[in-house]
A protein has these predicted regions:
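Surface-exposed extracellular loop regions of Gram-negative outer-membrane beta-barrel proteins
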Residues: 108, 255, 417-421, 494-498, ...
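N-terminal Sec signal peptide and the immediately downstream disordered periplasmic leader
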Residues: 1-71, 77-82, 734, 784
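Gram-negative outer-membrane beta-barrel transporters
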Residues: 29-33, 409-414, 463, 472, ...
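Outer-membrane beta-barrel translocator/receptor signature
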Residues: 97, 114, 134-137, 143, ...
Length: 785
């Protein structure tokens, strides 16, 4: 396997090097400037400074303002279709989302931090609620461990969202669209130069209201309703030529409902902690040795299928995921404030100080069906999960160049203080009026204080080595995280403590210290071709389980704590941008291998009679992969592109035991298809003088994947099929008039597919899944002024 992998690396580099021959490419000369390929230059900030994508020695995908609009990327789900290799996973509902990249993910009900972290204007933001992408200048997806440059360490990658900055002239845009499912959206922004060049303001807003895709045949309500309001104020101050300040405050108020999980498959009776197939069926009479109990239950729960649990799951499969029979309330409320403040002070032409302040205040409530059926086996009741996450961060950077520009560097100090208060209600096995419902309350506060110091630099060693264009990159970061978790008085593990002999410690606390590093070598062979190799070490912080009694020690040993997850990778890549003959083109290739130790994964278990999803450490895994993307413009009016990602992720040491529960082997790897890819064609054509038309088609496809880490053992049947999605856009634009009218058709062939699920088979004998969006259409009118 390693020989095949190495041969692939050599072959890829050979192909790109061959493109440098005079017959294959029109050279534009050598030097430090970008290639004159005819393609629009793409700028990225993956190394905390602005540079061309083609000269950045890391794997990164970028969507600019125009790409976001043409592909109608307005949410996380759209982002997955635009960036193969990135998975946007839904857990309990369609509005509880997490990114997965290069095999790194976070399980539902896990207490661990996400492995792929989102950033808003360089400020790391928490939470897992779905968001709206509007008035952005770019979205960048950084792939692989991020341990030396960004606010927090991560083992999978980062998603960087950058908002549009205020302009120097009065202007802006307004956009509105209408679609099926009563989908209405209004969006706009205006630039106001309060003091020309000195004080610039931009105000943008977003409003969307739509009916959900799911129909609840029991209540007539819909799952997935959207009622979203966003407002953003950006203020840029330039008091002098060397000092600038960029302030952004973003507010979101989101209501509606969620698309809920639906039953996917069941396991045989006796395979789960709760025998739902027996309790919710005519067999209830036998279970309690009392005739008439099932009829009594049905009378108290009108609308429930009298044939029982197994028959209900089969009927749900026949109905499809958009007609549900749910007995649980469906609530979704979010109110979020996110602030970023970036001050830059240029000490000289080669030295700059940057100060980045961030603040987030995220309130949320979400309640929905858990078990995916019409029976009250497990739900959040009328409360569900209520959370408040507050975070303050401060980062001081020194950015500069020295040695005549041969050395570029970034050094900094980072501090953050975070508090997460979460109250969760689970209603389990409601057999009323025969037996009372079990209400499990989990209520706790997690505090995290992080301090870090880091530095990274790139040195041109061409003169020293005699190899033109050769440079080396090295970076390191020391992080210290103080984590504390406290169960509150009404938490199930405090109100109903464990049997004698189990010593509680409340609060629990620990300090996690780690050194992350980056070491890379890159060569700019010409203006058009960059080759690089890099190895990185990063980690995901340890912590304490929310759904576990406060027992000292790690979960694998019977305690409530889980250890840091550590990732070490090696990546080689090539980036080429030039002209093949007279045709502008761009090609990026990355090949990587990564070893993960103490992988943080969820295990659904029973602890002292309470059901819990707790984070454990799986000893080791290995991930290998290849990522390729390219664009070619055969003519000025046609652009073609394709990308593909292959991921081979395996647990290599997978056995884990938790408290009194049996040992479990983890595998296969969840949330990661082996193959994913996309192709697009973008055609522009004149209509009349001043009017231009465009037609774009995007096709995304992926192979099957698993939504449970224990599909081979505890949760069989938690595999979802691969799928192919086609999106179309037809637009007419008047550049002089400043207006555009566009029609979109998403999921054109109405493919039924699933974007995540929960492996509940070991607890409730059923696995559940969340569907992706069905076919939708919309028409947008946009005007720039």
């Amino acid at each position: 396997m390693k020989i095949k992998y190495l041969s692939g690396v050599i072959s890829a580099v050979t192909v790109l090097t061959a493109l440098q021959s005079p017959c294959a490419i029109a050279q534009t000369g050598t030097g430090a400037t970008g290639s004159d390929s005819g393609l629009e230059e793409v700028l990225v900030t993956a190394q905390r400074r602005s540079e061309s994508l083609s000269r950045t020695p890391v794997a990164v995908a970028v969507l600019g303002t125009e790409s976001l609009a043409r592909q109608a990327v307005i949410s996380e789900a759209d982002l997955q279709l635009a960036v193969p290799g990135l998975t946007v996973k839904a857990g309990q509902s369609s509005n509880q989302l997490n990114y997965a990249l290069r095999g790194q993910t976070v399980d539902s009900f896990s207490s661990s931090r996400a492995s792929v972290l989102p950033y808003f204007n360089e400020v790391q933001v928490g939470g897992s609620a779905s968001t709206a992408f509007y008035d952005l200048s770019s979205i960048q997806v950084l792939k692989g461990p991020q341990g030396t440059l960004f606010g927090r360490n991560s083992t999978g990658g980062a998603v960087l969202m950058t908002t549009a900055k205020p302009g120097e002239e009065l202007g802006g845009y307004v956009s509105g669209w209408l679609g099926d499912y009563e989908n209405r959206k209004v969006e706009g922004a205006i630039d106001v130069p309060i003091v020309p060049e000195k004080v610039l303001m931009r105000v943008s807003g977003y409003y969307q209201k739509a009916d959900g895709f799911q129909e609840n045949i029991r209540t007539g309500d819909r799952g997935g309703d959207i009622d979203r309001k966003n407002l953003r104020v950006s203020l840029t101050l330039n008091p002098t030529d060397s000092i600038s300040n960029e302030f952004v405050l973003d507010y979101a108020d989101v209501g509606g409902t969620s698309m809920v999980s639906v039953a996917y498959n069941t396991v045989p009776l006796g395979s789960s902690f709760v025998p739902t197939q027996l309790l919710y069926s005519p067999g209830l009479d036998t279970a309690f040795a009392t005739p008439g109990l099932w009829d009594l239950f049905l009378a108290a729960h009108p609308g429930t299928d009298p044939e029982g649990f197994e028959a209900s799951v089969a009927k749900q499969r026949e109905r499809g995921p958009f007609k549900i029979n749910s007995d649980a309330p469906n609530i979704r409320e979010n109110e979020n404030y996110v602030m970023s403040n970036i001050t830059s002070f240029e000490l000289s032409d080669t030295l700059k100080i940057r100060n980045i302040i961030g603040y987030t205040d995220l309130d949320s409530q979400i309640a929905s069906e858990f078990d995916g059926t019409e029976y009250p086996a497990d739900s959040g009741g009328d409360i569900g999960r209520i959370g408040n996450l507050k975070q303050f961060s401060e980062e001081l950077q020194l950015v500069g160049e020295s040695a005549g520009g041969a050395l570029s560097y970034v050094a900094g100090l980072y501090y953050s203080d975070e508090e997460d208060n979460t109250y969760s209600l689970s209603q389990i096995v409601d057999l009323s009026p025969i037996a009372p419902v079990t209400k499990q309350i989990n209520n706790g506060r997690t505090s995290n204080e992080t301090k870090a110091v880091y530095a990274q630099g790139t040195l041109d060693i061409g003169d020293m080595t005699g190899v033109d264009g050769l440079s080396v990159t090295a970076g390191a970061r020391y992080s210290e995280e103080d984590v504390e978790f406290k169960h509150k008085a009404d938490d199930v593990y405090i109100a109903n403590p464990a049997p004698p002999g189990a010593v509680f410690e409340n609060p629990l606390s620990d300090t996690f210290e780690q050194v992350s590093w980056t070491l890379g070598l890159q060569q700019q062979l010409s203006d058009d071709l960059l080759l690089y190799a890099v190895t990185r070490r990063s980690y995901r912080s340890g912590g304490f389980n929310y759904f576990a009694p406060p027992l000292a020690g790690f979960g694998n040993e019977g305690g409530a704590e889980y250890q840091e997850e550590k990732a070490t990778d090696f990546e080689v890549g090539a980036k080429w941008e030039g002209t093949a003959g007279d045709v502008p083109a761009r090609l990026n290739i990355a090949l990587y291998t990564m070893t993960i130790e103490d992988i943080q994964r969820s295990n659904y278990v029973s602890i002292f009679g309470q059901l819990a999803g707790i984070t454990v450490n799986v000893p080791e895994s290995e991930i290998k992969g290849v990522e390729i993307d390219g664009v070619i413009n055969p003519t000025q009016w046609l652009s073609l592109g394709a990308s593909v990602a292959y991921t081979d992720a395996q647990f290599t040491d997978s056995a884990v035991s938790v408290l009194q529960n049996p040992e479990v082997d983890f595998g296969p790897y969840p949330d990661q298809p082996d193959w994913s890819g996309s192709v697009f064609a973008d055609l522009s054509f004149p209509i009349t003088d001043g009017l231009e038309g465009s037609l774009r088609a995007d096709v995304y496809s992926q192979t099957s994947s698993y939504f449970s880490s224990t599909a081979d053992t505890l949760n069989p049947g938690s595999k979802i099929d691969g799928y192919t999605i086609t999106n179309l856009r037809l637009a007419v634009e008047s550049e002089d008039g400043g207006w555009t009218v566009a029609a979109y058709l998403k999921n054109a062939f109405d493919e039924t597919y699933y974007v995540g699920g929960i492996g509940f088979a070991s607890l409730f004998a059923v696995n559940t899944v969340i569907p992706g969006a069905p076919r939708t259409y919309m028409v947008e009118a946009r005007y720039k002024f």
